[in-house]
Amino acid sequence: IALVGDAAHCIGESTKVIDAEGQLIAPGFLDGHIHIESSMMTPIEYAKAVIPHGTVGIYYDPHEVCNVLGLKGVDLMAEEAEKTPLKAMLTTPSCVPAVPGFEDSGAEITAADIASEMKHDYTVGLGEMMNFPGITSSAEPTHNIPGETLKAGKIITGHYSIPETGCGL
């Protein structure tokens, strides 16, 4: 809502006017962290399920799809998410596999891959950093991944500690 009252001076050729007199207006919900594929739905079906309940935007991290299909899977999800009415903001998976040597995956993400993915308009930042050993041991390949995100001027998301708890990641 930009203005309540007479807005005649703001109306132009491409302005969409919605007469909401007598109606209730509520803000939409923005989901700050979601893995669409965990719902066992495609982005289109996910949008159909959540929009009627007030979700209008999502920050999504398709790391499970990336574990299977690599960046091709991430890009396929992003292309489909753009076809929905949701404001879908991709956070590129940061850890594929989540912890190298701990699990098998169908792909591997490097800092060069992250640099490439950050060039997409639909990519707003980096998804959760799950490689706890790589971060705490200051492993250069692990640290280069968020570094590429910062070079691109984009955000880094994740599971962070609360200083008051004294806990780690």
Locate predicted features.
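Loop-rich non-cytosolic ectodomains and luminal regions
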Residues: 14-16, 28, 110, 148, ...
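Gly/Ser/Thr-rich helix-start
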Residues: 6, 23, 29, 55, ...
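Histidine-rich, glycine-flanked metal-binding segment
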Residues: 1-27
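Di-metal (Zn2+ and/or Mg2+/Mn2+) metal-binding site signature of metallo-dependent hydrolases
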Residues: 23-46
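Short acidic loop-to-helix transition motifs that present clustered carboxylates
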Residues: 161-166
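Histidine-centered active-site/metal-ligand motif
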Residues: 33-35, 63, 159-160
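Short loop/edge segments at beta-strand edges and connector loops
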Residues: 5-6, 92, 160
